[in-house]
Design a protein with these regions (language model features):
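Sec-dependent N-terminal signal peptides
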Residues: 1-15
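Short N-terminal leader segment in a subset of presequences, especially plant chloroplast
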Residues: 11-12, 28-33, 58
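N-terminal "mature-domain start" segment
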Residues: 21-41, 87, 136
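Alpha-helix C-terminal capping segments
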Residues: 23-25, 74-80, 137
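Extracytoplasmic/secreted proteins, especially bacterial periplasmic and envelope-associated proteins
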Residues: 27, 31, 70, 74, ...
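Surface-exposed amphipathic alpha-helical segments
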Residues: 36, 117-139
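Conserved polar/disulfide-associated segments of primarily extracytoplasmic proteins
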Residues: 40-126
Length: 139
């Protein structure tokens, strides 16, 4: 299996966490932490901490001929993002969601597929976010 994300981009930010187990979402698998709930909706999977203090959404889709940079630019524009940066083959940016909460995004992929992870409440569960990102595996 191929990793969707290069761990080097985010390893320094996160440590280990306890996990409930690997869940299969069609195009990818991910370890969902204990105390979190995952729900699929089309190409997007939402993973929410049960106390609602943190969440992640993971979207895996086809690039349809666009470069990762073009896709990153489109998401930054659509979400009102800022601080777009390239990091080890991935792109990161920040934005404020519709509820006024600051969110962070990581976009990575290859010529065929991309994965976008949007994280909200990172400060409330940094270890869990690190494991979610590092466990994401394309099928």
């Amino acid at each position: 299996m191929k990793r969707l994300f290069t761990a080097a981009a985010l390893v320094a930010l996160f440590a280990a966490a306890a996990f409930a187990g690997v869940q299969d979402f069609g195009k990818f698998t991910v370890d969902v932490p204990e105390g979190w709930t995952a729900t699929a909706d089309g190409e997007t999977v939402g993973i929410v901490k049960n106390d609602n203090t943190a969440s992640a959404s993971i979207t895996v889709s086809e690039t349809e001929g666009s470069s990762l940079k073009e896709i990153a630019d489109a998401f930054v524009q659509a979400l009102g993002g800022k601080n777009l940066a390239a990091d080890n083959g991935a792109y990161t940016f920040e934005f404020t969601n519709q509820n006024g909460v600051d969110s962070k995004a990581v976009l990575s992929g290859d010529d065929k597929n991309y994965a976008l992870i949007i994280m909200t409440g990172v400060e409330n569960a940094p270890d869990d976010f690190g494991k979610i990102i590092n466990s994401l595996t394309e099928k």
